[in-house]
Amino acid sequence: MEYKTIRRSQYISPFGVGAIYDFSGESMIAADINKWAGDYGEILRLKRLESRLNIKYFKAPTTYNKFNSTRINMKYSIPFERFPKWLFCKICGQMEYWGRAKEIENKIPMCKKEKCNNKKLTPMRFVMACEKGHIEDIDWRYWVHSHKTSTNDACKLDNQLEFKSKENSSGAALATVACRACGASRAIKGISQKKALTSIGIKCRGRQPWERADKEVKCDGEVRAIQRGASNLYY
C-alpha cells in the first residue's frame, strides 16, 4: 500500500469517516476515530455544539510528520483501509482477496500470472452495506455458488473466482463472476436490487472494513449491494 496525502479539511468532507477514496486505480475507505493516533490532534472548543451533542470537546484530524524524505511517521497519520478487498485482473479476470497479510509498504496489488505482466489489480465495482451503516465486501464465493446445493473444497480458495465482462462494456448487466473449480457462474445483473443479497442468505456481519473479525456485533440490518463510488454509500 502506498502513502498518499490529502488536505486536513478534506478529511471532514469529502473524505470523512466511511468515505471511499480513489487514487491511481486503488480504492480506500477512511477509518473511524478509534483508529486515530491516540492523544494527538488539536483540541477544538465549540461549547454550544458540545452541549447539544453531549460531548467534552472536538479534535482536529492529525497530520503526519516525515522523519526524512523516505520515511513517514505513521503515529500521526489518519488510517485508510483498502476497500473493497476483492480485486480482479482486467487481463485474465482472476479475482483475489487482498487482505492485510498481503499488504506491503509502497507496493500495489498486481496479478501474478506471467501473461498479465504485473497488471495492477482493479477493485470490484460493488460492495455491500446495511441499513444500519455497516459496510462490507460482498461474499462473491457465496454469490457464485448460491444456486448450487454443494461445492468442493477447491471452491473455498480465494484464487478460484474469475470476473468476466464483455469487451468494451462498462455495464454490470454484461458481467459475471465464475468459479473455475466447479464451473458455477452468476451474472452481476440485478445484484443491486432490493432483497438480491438477503434472498440468497447473505447477512450483515455487523462490522466495518477497518475492524477485525472479533469486533463483529449482531446486526439484523437488511443488506444491499451498492456501487462503491455511489454517493448514497457515504451520505
Predicted region positions:
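Extended, Lys/Arg-rich, non-catalytic nucleic-acid recognition/anchoring regions
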Residues: 1-235
